[in-house]
């Protein structure tokens, strides 16, 4: 069974970045999508590690959004 889940979304003047978790039986993939483009793909055997990385990235992107806005 597979599943996709949007974890967060950050909008700024330059566009919107969306973080997705794509799951399958081998683990989970974290994807950052900026507009139509995948800008980051990372594989994790454990969802807990993926969630931790997603929180770190969200904080970074929210900070960038505040600085540019």
Language model features with spans:
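Acidic-residue sensor for enzyme active/binding pockets
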Residues: 6, 29, 42, 58
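Short arginine-rich
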Residues: 55-68
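Short, surface-exposed linear segments at secondary-structure transitions and domain or protein termini
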Residues: 26-31, 48-57
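The feature represents the first ordered module of a protein
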Residues: 1-17
């Amino acid at each position: 069974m597979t599943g996709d889940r949007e974890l967060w979304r950050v909008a700024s003047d330059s566009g919107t970045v969306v973080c997705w978790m794509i799951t399958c039986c081998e683990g989970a993939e974290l994807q950052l999508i900026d507009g139509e483009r995948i800008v980051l793909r990372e594989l994790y055997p454990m969802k807990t590690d993926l969630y931790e990385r997603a929180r770190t990235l969200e904080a970074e992107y929210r900070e960038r959004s505040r600085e540019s806005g």
